Amino acid sequence: MIYQSPTIQVELLEDNIAKLCFNAPGSVNKFDRETLASLDAALDSIKQQSNIQALVLTSGKDTFIVGADITEFLGLFAQDDAVLLSWIEQANAVFNKLEDLPFPTASAIKGFALGGGCETILATDFRIADTTAKIGLPETKLGIIPGFGGTVRLPRVIGADNALEWITTGKDQRPEDALKVGAVDAVVAPEALEAAAIQMLKDAVAEKLDWQARRQRKMSPLTLPKLEAMMSFTTAKGMVFAVAGKHYPAPMAAVSVVEQAATKGRSDALQIEHQAFIKLAKTDVAKALIGIFLNDQLVKGKAKKAGKLAKDVKSAAVLGAGIMGGGIAYQSASKGTPIVMKDIAQPALDLGLGEAAKLLSAQVARGRSTPEKMAKVLNNITPALDYAPVKHADVVVEAVVEHPKVKAQVLAEVEQYVSEDAIIASNTSTISINLLAKSMKKPERFCGMHFFNPVHKMPLVEVIRGEHSSEETIASVVAYASKMGKTPIVVNDCPGFFVNRVLFPYFAGFNGLLAEGGDFAAIDKVMEKQFGWPMGPAYLLDVVGLDTGHHAQAVMAEGFPDRMGKSGNDAIDVMFENKRLGQKNGKGFYAYSVDSRGKPKKDVDPTSYELLKAAFGEQKAFDADEIIARTMIPMIIETVRCLEEGIVASPAEADMGLVYGLGFPPFRGGVFRYLDTMGVANFVALADKYAHLGGLYQVTDAMRALAANNGSYYQA
């Protein structure tokens, strides 16, 4: 053994080829500080051996290296620029040391080689992947750029255009795609991986492969003619900005770094990367996006823990077909859990099966599935007009019409047919779980399971704990949601649960602006373009449906009359009473039609303005700051109330609910990250300016105390 540490082992194989194996404790290899220090020491030990002729990098795990240890990032990025620069220069010195070894090097890549893992393989002369490999630089998804030489080496290996696509999208690349562009030199079966890498090194030692020429190319400026370079980078900037927009600076910064470094050798090019990395690491966007990643890990960790308490869900059932039932059935079956789809009407079953078939056909058309897989998934969905096939289900999801009496009746019925230990969940967006539990003989096996529409696209599931729900029930539904590929957050029962409870105060702020003559299209523009929502409030209400919004608003007003009660009609009422239901009937705030390509089209409709003018008078202009304040303050305060009341367990889970359930702008990180970035005291001062507008604008005592102590919701 040449070197051994808890994370890395180095041994000498036949023919004087050294093997460096990444094998950290735990399930995966990460590039944390300990691993980086071990790699540095291992390379020093290797350099001291005079007989080594080549080096192969391998992994003792199912994956190569999943990337940097992101849990270290926020603390590290809070350091002074000088400290951060010192860290990044030391890290890069290790990668340079690997690249500068006086003999050929190769990486044997299996599973993920992402971020720092990808930058490790780029520092070697040859790269051989097996068929399980996924390679990529996802850093821009975290608001930063690669910091261990990725922006320098990748363009010199696969060309600037290909490298910019990899870096700016942050997507994982399949081995066959990596082979096409030259990021890897061969793709082999997993059992042949190490032997293939060693054979390539033997060929290099025997001078059949010119490893020194390959290495020199990575050390040198890019070989791009000046005019071609200018055209390439100008085109890239336009394309990247069109996708990333102004709120996500990292992809554009990556293009600039590659452009500036194009004429430089390795040393100068790395300095350009370092400076850009440090600048981005200090941004609020990086803090927000890294925060989302860490919050996602926390939520997934909780779900994994729940799996230990959970009942094993081998089969499921959904009551109520149609679009929602079909979506739930598709999601369950496509992720491997067979499901019965039960309805009282054959046309509804046909619609549900049609929805599942449509979603599967789209997967096949995009090359993400095959006709054989599609048939297998459809065979996992059993349509039924009676309860007989439901009796074997481990979990039953009730998804009938959103009406308390109908749901209560269906829940009471299904309880008679299922096994004693089957778990029953209601997919409801507004009806109290405690109320529905009254219709059940065993309320301890019952909880809420709120899917968001469309089911196949929306990642969030709210698992709602009723006062009688057992821990096993909650754990089992959380585990089932995870198995379906969803991100579950557990919330306690209250009107609107968590997501809808905080959404409707936002709509109330919007209604308030319209009642004073605000222009809904202008408000949407501000909330989309400036704040960053995927849809402004008027457009979102049209998509949700004004009938659904009208009903949910009434539920919220009844549940929280002091804050959400109304004294008269608002804009939602005006649209609903004039049968303008949104996209579903082609007219809401906007008018909807289909364009020549069959895609839905949204247009401003003069009729909406006439109706609003008749109800609220002449239009009045509001500036962007006031629009943002008056819509967001109520949502933010209500989110804080949910945390204080224990409806949601932590700021992290609340922020994930907002990002995954509502599309809260990821670059802002969620309500609590947004509050911390803004400063709680600054927010309280802003809210106090609007406190005269009513209870939705009045901060809680606990918020005021936190502001007075200069506190924050996240611990740095």
UniProtKB/Swiss-Prot annotation:
Catalyzed chemical reaction(s): a (3S)-3-hydroxyacyl-CoA + NAD(+) = a 3-oxoacyl-CoA + NADH + H(+); a (3S)-3-hydroxyacyl-CoA = a (2E)-enoyl-CoA + H2O; a 4-saturated-(3S)-3-hydroxyacyl-CoA = a (3E)-enoyl-CoA + H2O; (3S)-3-hydroxybutanoyl-CoA = (3R)-3-hydroxybutanoyl-CoA
Pathway involvement of the protein, from the record: Lipid metabolism; fatty acid beta-oxidation
Catalytic activity, EC: 4.2.1.17, 5.1.2.3, 5.3.3.8, 1.1.1.35
GO biological process, one term: fatty acid beta-oxidation
Pfam families reported for this sequence: 3HCDH, 3HCDH_N, ECH_1
InterPro entries in UniProt: 3-OHacyl-CoA_DH_CS, 3-OHacyl-CoA_DH_NAD-bd, 3HC_DH_C, 6-PGluconate_DH-like_C_sf, ClpP/crotonase-like_dom_sf, Enoyl-CoA_hydra/iso, FA_oxidation_alpha_subunit, FadB
Active site positions: 450 (for 3-hydroxyacyl-coa dehydrogenase activity)
Entry-linked Gene3D superfamilies: 1.10.1040.50, 2-enoyl-CoA Hydratase, Chain A, domain 1 (3.90.226.10), NAD(P)-binding Rossmann-like Domain (3.40.50.720)
Positions that bind substrate: 296, 500, 660
Region feature Enoyl-CoA hydratase/isomerase, mapped onto this chain: 1-189
Keywords: Fatty acid metabolism, Isomerase, Lipid degradation, Lipid metabolism, Lyase, Multifunctional enzyme, NAD, Oxidoreductase
Record-annotated site: Important for catalytic activity: 119, 139
GO-annotated molecular function: 3-hydroxybutyryl-CoA epimerase activity; delta(3)-delta(2)-enoyl-CoA isomerase activity; enoyl-CoA hydratase activity; long-chain-3-hydroxyacyl-CoA dehydrogenase activity; NAD+ binding
Region listing for 3-hydroxyacyl-CoA dehydrogenase, in residue ranges: 311-716
A GO term from the CC aspect: fatty acid beta-oxidation multienzyme complex
Domain of life from the UniProt record: Bacteria
The keyword Isomerase belongs to this UniProt entry's keyword annotation: yes
Binding site for NAD(+): 324, 343, 400-402, 407, 429, 453
Similarity comment: In the N-terminal section; belongs to the enoyl-CoA hydratase/isomerase family.
Subunit organization: Heterotetramer of two alpha chains (FadB) and two beta chains (FadA).
HAMAP family assigned to the protein according to its UniProt record, in alphabetical order: FadB
Annotated function: Involved in the aerobic and anaerobic degradation of long-chain fatty acids via beta-oxidation cycle. Catalyzes the formation of 3-oxoacyl-CoA from enoyl-CoA via L-3-hydroxyacyl-CoA. It can also use D-3-hydroxyacyl-CoA and cis-3-enoyl-CoA as substrate.
Name of the molecule in the record: Fatty acid oxidation complex subunit alpha
